[in-house]
């Protein structure tokens, strides 16, 4: 039957080719199901504070990634622990939630009831903070990390083990056992 051209917004940050590919895949799938996908790149608004923060974080992450490829000690002592354990902690997510609020003005003229798929947690968090009512947070990683949580959205994952890890908030607070979502 299809969606008869109903709109769906694909929210993204175009942070690296991987996130761009995920966004293109979501837009393509939506189109194949009969939706009209609209691309919302939160990093593309030149003067918006939220966009500037995303671009700065992207630059910082890219720099860290390049250094980690060239300097083994940096990779072992800083980069790997940050990416495997630092982003996993629930406390890390709190700062991202505040940063996402800076993107709320970008949603000012968007109908809050249009279905929305965030292909990174920041667009998902921003959409929730902006009052969007049908937000899907497409989680790209199978390693459960609090970085990927967007409270108030529907979280999608790729595997049963990822589902269990996110459902149980596995390892997101090393000091205590968290209650399942």
What is the predicted function of each stretch?
Residues 1-4:
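Positively charged, low-complexity intrinsically disordered leader regions
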Residues 19-20, 123-126, 143-145, 163-164:
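Short, well-ordered alpha-helical microsegments
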């Amino acid at each position: 039957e299809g969606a008869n051209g109903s709109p769906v917004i694909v929210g993204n940050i175009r942070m690296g080719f991987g996130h761009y590919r995920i966004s293109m895949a979501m837009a393509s799938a939506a189109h194949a199901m009969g939706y009209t996908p609209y691309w919302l790149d939160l990093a593309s608004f030149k003067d918006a504070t939220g966009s500037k923060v995303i671009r700065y974080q992207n630059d910082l992450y890219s720099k860290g990634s390049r250094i980690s490829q060239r300097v083994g000690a940096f990779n072992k002592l800083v980069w790997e622990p940050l990416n495997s354990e630092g982003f996993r902690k629930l406390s890390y997510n709190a700062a991202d939630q505040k940063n996402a609020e800076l993107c709320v003005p970008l949603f000012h003229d968007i109908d809050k009831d249009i279905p929305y798929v965030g292909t990174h947690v920041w667009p998902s968090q921003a959409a929730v903070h902006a009052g969007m009512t049908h937000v899907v947070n497409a989680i790209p990683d199978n390693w459960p990390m609090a970085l990927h949580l967007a409270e108030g959205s529907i979280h999608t994952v790729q595997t049963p083990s990822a589902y269990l890890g996110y459902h149980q908030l596995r390892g997101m607070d090393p000091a205590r056992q968290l209650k399942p979502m």
